[in-house]
Design a protein with these regions (language model features):
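Conserved nucleotide-sugar donor-binding catalytic segment
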Residues: 79, 138-188
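Cell-envelope/extracellular polymer assembly enzymes that use nucleotide-activated donors
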Residues: 6-9, 37, 185
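N-proximal low-complexity "stem/linker" segments adjacent to membrane-targeting elements
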Residues: 1-30
Length: 188
């Protein structure tokens, strides 16, 4: 690769996700990405989430405090992020091996790109693929859609989307009044 690796910051919002967050963290830390900042924003969980987070002290930054929900947690994490490339990964989602290397390489070699999105798979707790129809639909639209299509349907998978800090500074924070479509609103 000719350009240097950009620093990537991943923010994970969490609340009472002790059963899943360890796998999420492992999927991020196992990426082997050379310049990674990982921030977990926990909403003062009452389950074992904080115990799980303590196991990763020194390998990520985590804060456990009350928040106003998922979007507030994401925004708090993005405010303290130092990466050139930003993303958020929910506490029950996983990155496939090599994902961040592919993202970093793409951003390094295409400095004009403001954001990047890719395909994803949706799996259950036993790693069985679910929602295949929706995933196929979104992945198909990725190849042919444009901004006009995005105004009609959200074909962008949040967990596979990354953007530059400059785009974040231009667009601002996610809209806290939206609880389920904040990502779609952000892409537009």
């Amino acid at each position: 690769m000719s350009a240097r690796w950009p620093r990537i910051t991943i923010v994970t919002p969490s609340y009472n996700q002790g059963a899943f967050i360890g796998q999420t963290i492992e999927s991020v830390l196992a990426q082997g990405y050379p310049d990674l900042e990982y921030i977990v924003m926990d909403g003062a969980s009452t389950d074992n989430t904080v115990e799980v987070l303590r196991q990763y002290d020194g390998r990520l930054t985590w804060i456990s405090e009350r928040d106003r929900g998922q979007v507030d947690a994401i925004n708090k994490g993005l405010r303290i992020a130092t990466g050139e490339v930003l993303a958020y990964l929910n506490s029950d989602d996983l990155y496939l091996p090599g994902a961040l290397l592919a993202v970093g390489r793409r951003f390094a070699n295409q400095p004009e790109s403001a954001w990047l999105t890719g395909r994803c798979r949706v799996v259950d707790q036993d790693n069985r693929e679910i929602r295949k129809g929706l995933t196929h639909y979104k992945n198909t639209w990725l190849r042919v859609a444009n901004y006009q299509t995005l105004q009609i349907t959200n074909f962008v998978s949040q967990m596979a989307t990354f953007w530059r800090r400059e785009a974040y500074q231009r667009v601002g924070e996610l809209n806290e009044s939206l609880h389920y479509v904040m990502d779609w609103d952000y892409w537009m």
